[in-house]
Amino acid sequence: MGLALGLFLIVIAATGSAIAFYKEMERALNAHMRMVEPQPQGWTLQDALKIRARLEAQDPHSSVFSLQLPQNSDEALFARVMPAIDPKSGREYALDYDELFANPYNGERLGRRRIGAATFHLEGLPSFLYYLHYALFLPFGAGILLIGILGLVWLVESMTGFWLTLPARPKKSKKGASPRPFHQRWASAWKIERKGNTNRLLFDLHRAPGLWLWPLLAIFAITGFALNLGGPYAHTVQRIAAYEHFQEAPPRETLPQPLINPPINWFKAAELGQRYFAQQAQREGFTLGKPAAIEYRRDLGLYFFLMHTSRDLLDAQGRPTETDSPATAATIAIDARDGRFVGLQLPTGQRAGNTLTSWLIALHVTAVGGRVWQVVVACFGLAVVLGCVTGLWLWWRRRVLR
């Protein structure tokens, strides 16, 4: 198990080091899709929803189910796409892309892609690394499941490794001398001895960084589980703390049949979302920022309207955290059948489990801490690679000696 985990972690940690700068990579390599020229007239939420409808109409086989709204004037509109359902057969159409980019000012379609698609073009590198990091390029569901399980295994392995570094209980001295204090006997595990032989150096390189970085190991192992297996994570956290996540543990059961054309359309859902947020802000005592995203789950018959609020985590510049899936934004769930308010989910200050999870995930995806934290995460990934490589080398040396 440890051998397989080490091999997988090398890939996960190496790609994680790179995508710590995912946003910068996207801006550098995909400026034609990600960046636009700011216009003085600006754009409105209604404009964005009209563009969404236009994008969907351009390909009747597509269903634009998620719209992420730009937070800066030079950013493109980002949409997630899934196959539409053929009304005759009841099956999904074949679709060779799942992301769309458009100019929020004029609706111009800037590009499309399938996340993680293998390509020899540099513009596909960020998406490829991102997909490799969280799905190992296995079929979508299998890769995500495997990474989630590996997160748990990694946590257990890390705890076991930490325990193994603890010094053994000292034997009683016949001469009655007092044993060295615990911290002195443990100190050697935290050091890298450069004067020893190669095996000792490799062992220290495997052990010492793991001790120094153990808090980060625990954070990234837990969040790897949370990001990939959100449902089991939600059910686990709910046993020990108040926690709610509409996407991973929906507030209602899956419908018998997908609700394709709901009575409440996107425009009405956005209107209701803003109204409900104004009511909840007054009730819960938070202030409202910009709308972050709007999504529709046809399997649940629910809209999710996301908005930045004073309960958001903030980045190094004091702005609300923002990723391709703004999980740290507040979310309101709306029934697509009658427009009923279903629930509110705040990133902080509402439920202890949500507050802790928001912080952990924001650290994982480098949404907080600015450039300094990005560098820390990148270096941490390289340290994990070093620990795995030295561990595999030591295993191989022992096997040869046997």
Language-model region placement:
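Conserved histidines in hydrophobic membrane contexts and catalytic metal-binding motifs
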Residues: M1-R402
